[in-house]
């Protein structure tokens, strides 16, 4: 996941 988007 991305640091700012947990669903990435």
UniProtKB/Swiss-Prot annotation:
Keyword S-adenosyl-L-methionine carried by entry: no
Cellular component annotations (GO), alphabetically ordered: extracellular region
Family matches, as InterPro entries: Contryphan_CS
Tissue and organ expression note: Expressed by the venom duct.
Compartments where found: Secreted
Annotated positions of the Cysteine amide modification: 8
Highest taxon of the lineage: Eukaryota
Keywords: Amidation, Disulfide bond, Hydroxylation, Ion channel impairing toxin, Neurotoxin, Secreted, Toxin
Molecular-function GO terms, alphabetical: ion channel regulator activity; toxin activity
Disulfide bonds: 2-8
PTM-bearing positions, type 4-hydroxyproline: 3
More details: Exists in two forms, due to cis-trans isomerization at 2-Cys-hydroxyPro-3. The cis conformation is the major form.
Functional summary from the UniProt entry: Its target is unknown, but this toxin may modulate voltage-activated calcium channels (Cav) or calcium-dependent potassium channels (KCa).
Protein family (similarity comment): Belongs to the O2 superfamily. Contryphan family.
Free-text note regarding domains: The cysteine framework is C-C.
UniProt protein name: Contryphan-Fib
């Amino acid at each position: 996941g991305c640091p700012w988007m947990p669903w990435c």
